Amino acid sequence: MEFLRLPQAMSRRGVNLLLALAPLATLARGSAALADSAPLTHAIAMHGQPALPPGFTHLPYADPKTPKGGRLVMGIQGTFDSLNPLVVLGVAPDAVPKYVQQSLLYRSADEPFTAYGLLASGVALDADRKELAFEIDERARFSDGRPVTAEDVIFTFEMLKAKGKPFHRSSLGRVTKVSAPSPRRVEFELGDGSNRELPLVIGAMPIFAKHATNAETFGETSFKPALGSGPYAVADVRPGESLLLKRRKDFWAEDHPLTRGLYNADEIRYDFYRDSNALFEAFKAGLYDVRIEGDPTRWMTGYDVPAVHDGRIRQETLHFDTPKGMTGLVFNTRRPIFADVRTREALGLLFDFEWVNRNLFHGVYRRAGSFFSDSDLSALGVPSDAREKGLLAAFPGAVREDILAGTWKPSETDGSGRDREQARRALELLMAAGYRLREGVLRNAKDEPFAFEITVTSRPQERLALNYAQSLSRLGIAVSVRLIDDVQYWRRLSAFDFDMIQWTWPASASPGNEQIGRWGSANAARNGALNYAGVKSPAVDAVLQALLGAREREDFVAAVRALDRLLISGFYVVPLYYLPDTWIALARGVVLAGRQPAYFLSNELLARLPAATPAN
C-alpha cells in the first residue's frame, strides 16, 4: 500500500503540494511504528550478522594513514544532460549521489550485503523486518551548515517514491507508513515484511535537503547540483563535457569510521568523450587516471605503448568473490518476431562463441550461461533440490527438464564459424516456430522475411553484432546493425524502442530488489525500467518474492537458483561471455589505498601519492 493515494485526476500542482505537506503530517503522527523491543544497533545485514562490531575504527580495507590531496580525473564515454541520475529523464553521471550526498547507511565492500550507520548513528529493525527506525547522527550537517533531520529523510522518501526511477517507485511503494516522532528519529512500517531487503534499500537512499530541493521540478533534467552532506561539492559544470568536484573543508564526517582512509583526493573531475576510441586514446595520452578495461583486444595489445613501458601507466588484474553477471544480446520479446521461445533458442544456437573468442578476443573470455556465474547461486551443472522444486511446483513446464536437472549448458560449436550441426538444430527450431527457408530467405507463414535490427553504442559492440549478423545470414535472416550515440541509445532503451541490444546485468553476492526491476512483470511496460527483455512470467514474479522473503541462506540460494533456471529456460538473451577477473589501468602515482575489498571495487579508495603529477 502506498503512503499517498492520489486521485487519477489530481493536477501536478496538487501532487507537489501533497509532497510538501506529507513530512509535516507524519511529524505530527508521533511514534507508534516501532516497538521499544527493537534496540538501536550500528548496522544491519541482509543475511547473517555484520562482520564489524560496534565501535569499529575504520573499514578493514581502508588505510586511515592514506595521504590526502591532489586531483583524480575520471574518463567516461558519452555525454550528460543532467546531474540527477535518480529520475527517468536525462543522462547523468553518478557523481552527485556518490560524492556530494550521503545515505543513512553505507554498504561495506568486504561483505555480501551489510550496511553500517553513516547519517544514521543507529538503526533498529525488528526480527520480522516489518518495522524500521533510524536515529540520525546529531553531528550530521548539509554543506550549508544546517542539520540533517528526519524531515529531510521523509521528504526524500516521498519524492523518490513519487518521481524517482521505477526501482525506487516500486521498492519504496511497499512502505505502508512513515513517521518522525522527533527531529532526529524516523520510523518506517514495511507491510508484511516479505521484502527483507527493503530496510537496506531505504538505508541507501541519497538524502536531499528539503529546504534546498524543489520537489516540483525533481523529475526534470537539471544541471543544478543537489545540496548534500557528503565530502565533496560541485565546483564546476560544463554541460556534456566535464564535471568538477572539490573537497569540502567543513565536511561533518571527516573522522567518521566509514570515511577514514576514503575520499582521498582534493578534487575529482569527470571528463566525457564521444566514443570508446577517443576515451582510450585520451587515457594513453595521460588525460585521465583510472580505466576499467573490458575489451580483451585492447588489454592484450592496446597497452603496448611508451606510457606503459616507462611506467606512466600500469596494468593490474583484480579478482573479487562476486558472481559474474550476464552479458548477452537481449531479445525485446515485446516484438512479435521474438515472442516464440523456440525462435529465441534457435538464434542463440547461431552464436559461435568458440570462433568469436579465439579470433576476436584472444581466447580470454569464458562462456556465459548463468546469470550468476562462478558462484553457488548459479544453477548451471547443479540439479534442483527439494527447495527449488517446491518453489516451482505451481508452475509446471516453466523450467525445462534438462535445465531442472542441471545438465543443460550453452551450445558449443566446432569453432569454424560455420558449424553445420548447430545450423541444422537452429533451423529445426525455427521451422517448429512456423518459419520456412525459401530461396535463401527465412520467411514466416505470411511470407514475411525474418529481419531485425541490433542497436549498438560502441565500435566493439558493432564488431560483435556484425559478426553475429553474418552468422544469421547463412540461414536467410537479415540483420541490420545501427550504431547510435549515448543520448539516443538511452532514450530508446527507456522507451523499449529496439529489437536487440547488447547488455550486461552485473551480479552481486546478495541479489535482491534490483532483480524485480530487471525481470518483474510490472516493469515490462514501465518506461525507464530495466526489464529490457520484456519478461512477463508469473513463475518469475513468484520466485522473486521468495528471494526477497528468504530468511535462511539455504532458502535464499534456492530462490536465486530457481530464478536462474527460469531465465535460462526463457532464452531471453543470447548468452555471450564474461571475464573472471577485473582489469584496471592506473596512471602513475594513483593507487587503491589500503587493500582490495573482497566483493567489489570501491572507488572511494583511490588516492594520488603526493609526488605524482596529476593528469591535465
Where are these regions (language model features)?
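Detector for C-terminal structural segments
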Residues: 15, 22-23, 38-40, 76-78, ...
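N-terminal lobe/hinge region of extracytoplasmic solute-binding protein
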Residues: 36-128, 135, 158, 227
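Aromatic- and charge-enriched surface segment that lines or borders ligand/interaction sites
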Residues: 62-67, 89-96, 122-166, 181, ...
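Gly/Pro-rich hinge or "lid" segments in bacterial periplasmic/extracellular proteins
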Residues: 79, 101-113, 158, 202-262, ...
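Aromatic-rich, solvent-exposed beta-strand/loop patch
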Residues: 117-121, 143, 148, 172, ...
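Surface-exposed binding/hinge segments that line
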Residues: 135, 169-214, 231-238, 383-395
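Ligand-site clamp/hinge motif
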Residues: 137, 220, 253-304, 345, ...
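Extracellular/periplasmic solute-recognition and catalytic clefts
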Residues: 177-179, 235-246, 271-335, 342-346, ...
